[in-house]
Structure formats: C-alpha cells, structure tokens
C-alpha cells in the first residue's frame, strides 16, 4: 500500500519564496536551487538538510535548514553600494523576524522560523557582494 505524504520541502521553499516576492514586489528575483545568470541582484534558496526533533506514533517534528543567498553586483562598488546591500540585509532579516510562524499550502504550520547566522562576503575586485544566511524553521508533519 502506498504511503500518503506531503512534500514538506516544496511547501516550505514555496512559502519562503512567496514571502520574498510579496515583500520585494518583483524588484528582487528569487530562485530555488541553482540561480541562472540573473542580473545584478537576486535571492537564491537552497535546501541543505533537516533534523528530527521529535518522533512518535502520531507525528514527527523536524527542523529544516535552508541556505539563503543574497547576491548583489555593481561595478565600482562605493559606499552607496554597500549601503544598498546593508539595507537589503536588514530588510530581509526583519521580514523573517515578522514571519516567525507561517501557514503552508497544506494548512500545516512552520514555527520558530529564524535566520541563525549571516556572513557578508564582499569581492571588491569583482564588485560583488554575497550575503549568506542559515534559515531554520520547525514543522510537525506525518500527523495521523
């Protein structure tokens, strides 16, 4: 007999992408997986793993981890370019903070959603800034 399941990864990634698209209203492309050569700025979401937190007969709780990358390229990056990057960093972090709990398309909930670490990787010669976050969220699924 086949198992019934929800594609939690797809639901979580779609919700996260929709949060970004709603907030930035088309000004910041968002890609899941490999980002094509997408221009001067974009966000890339890459699933990296999950950890089982609680397992019992009626459900399981997992913590999902997603690598979030903000890419910004500007030739001859000056102070204004860095200001732009830091404004986006702060706005993205505020967006995630304001959505610590969200409902997925299957009506299940994500909770304890947060950005745990952030790393700013400037490449002054290439005029590129890459900002990486480790996004984590918890989900209870396989409820019977």
Locations of regions flagged by a protein language model:
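Charged, amphipathic alpha-helical segments and their flanking helix caps
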Residues: 1-34, 49-144
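A short, hydrophobic beta-strand-centered structural micro-motif
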Residues: 40-48
């Amino acid at each position: 007999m086949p198992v019934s399941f929800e594609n939690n990864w797809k639901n979580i990634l779609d919700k996260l992408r929709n949060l970004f698209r709603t907030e930035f209203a088309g000004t910041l492309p968002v890609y899941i997986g490999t980002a094509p050569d997408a221009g001067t700025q974009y966000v890339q979401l890459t699933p990296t793993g999950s950890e089982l937190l609680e397992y019992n007969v009626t459900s399981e709780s997992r913590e999902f981890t997603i690598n979030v990358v903000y890419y910004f390229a500007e030739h001859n990056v000056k102070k204004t370019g860095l200001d732009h990057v830091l404004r986006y960093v702060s706005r993205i972090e505020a967006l995630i903070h304001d959505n610590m709990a969200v409902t997925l398309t299957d009506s299940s909930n994500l909770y304890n959603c947060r950005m745990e670490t952030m790393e700013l990787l400037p490449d002054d010669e290439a005029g590129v800034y890459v900002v990486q976050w480790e996004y984590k969220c918890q989900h209870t699924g396989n409820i019977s």
